[in-house]
Amino acid sequence: MVEKSLMNNIMKRIIYTILTMVVLGTMMYSCKKDGYFVGGDLHNPKINLTTYDWLKSNKDGVFDTVIMLIDKAGVKDKINKQGITFFAPTDYDIYNYVQARSIAMQRIDPEKKWTVDSMIKYELPRFADSIDMYIVNQTLPNDLLTENGTKYKNAKGKDVVVSYEPTDDPNLGYNEASSVRPRIVYFSYLFQALGNNVPASDIVLPVGIRTRVQTSNAQTTTGVVHVLNNSHILFFYR
């Protein structure tokens, strides 16, 4: 079953993450603002692969279920469209979604459960449409982003805010011994109108949801990819 495979893969990745956290903690302080992190290593942001192929080639398989749903929904061309930015969810974000859906259903019927198989059976049209939430029809590398954030239209025509904010959080790479203050990309999805002078850091519900990017500035042959963190819930489900 797809659901069992997803659970097994996620558990393996959780164990891997725990084992590598200490190493990552000592490596992250050297992050440069124009780089991006994959597994704690600095890489040149230029990637000689399409967005789809880069996600599919991830050595830890953190996009396996995402890629499967993209294939089944027939939206490969959407994320490979030339000149876009894709804020990519991970398999963890899909897991968070099916868990949240299950909890909501079980308030009515404790025996009900929502799974990845349920998504394949019932939600591929929704997935095909909602993937547009994560696409901005222009390239947004880190050097074009601002601390207070800028509003853009996503591919569904809805407002999103993308910002590039400094952090003093040691868990996000800050080290008081370093002269370089790390910066983090945030992707904020808006449910309500936002004034032009409101900084992205002030966005809260019910106005919108801020989602931190865990891997930023990946510049593929077709566009830019910013990978959302593993606590995100697919479709901004709430």
Please state what every model-predicted region is.
Residues 16, 29-238:
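Mature, structured domains of secreted/extracytosolic soluble proteins
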Residues 1-31:
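Sec-dependent bacterial lipoprotein signal peptides
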